[in-house]
Amino acid sequence: MANGAGNGGGGAGGNGGGGNNGAGNRAEELQPHPVKEQLPGIQYCVNSPPPWLEAVVLGFQHYLLSLGITVLIPSLLVPLMGGGDAEKVKVIQTLLFVSGLTTLFQSFFGTRLPVIASASYAYIIPITSIIYSTRFTYYTDPFERFVRTMRSIQGALIITGCFQVLVCFLGVWRNIVRFLSPLSIAPLVTFTGLGLYHIGFPLVKKGPMIWDGNRCDRYGMMLCIPVVWLFAQLLTSSGVYDHKPQTTQTSCRTDRTGLITNTPCPTFDITDSFAMMAASFVTLFESTGLFYASARYGKNVGLLAMTKVGSRRVIQISAAFMLFFSIFGKFGAFFASIPLPIMASLYCIVLCFVSSAGLSFLQFCNLNSFNTKFILGFSFFMAISIPQYFREYYNGVGRCDKSDIHVTYNGCGNNCDSA
C-alpha cells in the first residue's frame, strides 16, 4: 500500500509538472506599447548640447537642408517677375538672412524649440497672383517690372507680418490651439510632411540615377552631398548635359543658375494684402504642426529626427551659417549651386519623419471608437481630395458648364469638348 501510494504520488507529481510546463509555453497575449512622452534613442536633448566640433558639423547640415527651399522658391518666382541671375542672388541672400535672424530669435526668446524658421510654399500662390497682375503688364523693361513687382510683394508681406504679430500677441491663436486634440493634431502634422510630396521623388527623377551605422545616420548629409555633387560637377564639366533638354540642364547642371558669376519703398495694395493674409493662416497651421511634432519627439522633425540630436546649439550654429553666407554672397552662391535633385533626395528622407510624427499622436486616441475613425479618415481623405479638385480645375478638367460644354468619358478621365 505504501509503495502504491508512493507511485501514485510520483505520477501525480509528474502530471502536475507537465501541467505547469504547458502553462509556461502558453502564448502571451499581445500588449500595446506604453505611451512615452519622449521617444528613446535621443543622444543630445535640448539642454545637453554636443561638443562644439560635432555641433558645427551638424549645424552645417541644417544649413544645407534649408538651402534647398531657399534656392528653389526664388528660382521659381524671380524669372516670372522679370529678374535675372543677379536679382535671384539678391533674393536668395535676403531669404537666408531673414531665416537665420528669425531662427536665432526663436531659439533665444520664442518657443526655444530646435526648429529652423525658413520660407514656406504657402505664399507661392498669392505671390504668383501678384506677379500676373494686369497692372504690371504695361512695363516693357524686365528690370523695372521686377522692381515694381517686388515692391508690391514687400508691401503685402509687411501687412501680413503685422497681421500675424497681432493674431499671436492678442492671444487669438493661443485660444485656437487650445482646442486642438491629439486626433486633430495627427492629420495636421502628418500632412505638413505629406503636403510637400511634390518636391521629393518628382525632382529626384530629373537627375542622373546613380555602411550602415550610427555615424552614417548622423552625418548622412555630409557624406552623400559632396559625393553626388562632385559626380554632378564631373558630368557638367564633361559635357554630358550639353545636348540634353533645357529642363534636364536646369535641374542637373551645377552651373545652371549663374549664381556664382552674378554675385549687389514698398508699395501697398489691399487686394494683394488680403491674398497674402489668407496664406498666412496656412503658415500658422503649418508652424503649429511643426512645433507639435518637435515637442512630441523631443527632437526636431526631419533632419533632427534622423540625427537624433535635438540641441538648440546646433540650430543656433545653423542660423549663424545662414547669416554668414547671406552677407558673403560668393560663399552662399557656391553652395546654392547644388543641383535640385540632390536636395530632393534629402527631402524624401526627412519629410518621412514629419509625417510619422503626426501618426505618432494616434497612440493618444481611442482607435476603437467609430467617431475617431470617421474624423481621422475624413481628414486624411479630404486633405488629398480637395487639392486634387483644384489641381484638375486649373488644368481645365474640373468644373464644366453643361449648357456650353458637352462632357464625354474617354476611359481615362473627364474630357470637356465644346458642343
Swiss-Prot record:
Keyword Membrane among UniProt keywords = yes
Q: What is its main location?
A: membrane
Classification via InterPro entries: NCS2
Write the record's keywords in alphabetical order, separated by commas: Membrane, Transmembrane, Transmembrane helix, Transport
Which Gene Ontology terms cover its molecular function? transmembrane transporter activity
Q: Where are the transmembrane segments?
A: 64-84, 91-111, 113-133, 153-173, 184-204, 220-240, 273-293, 313-333, 334-354, 370-390
Family note: Belongs to the nucleobase:cation symporter-2 (NCS2) (TC 2.A.40) family.
| Protein name as it appears in the record | Putative nucleobase-ascorbate transporter 9
Please tell me the species this chain comes from. Answer: Arabidopsis thaliana
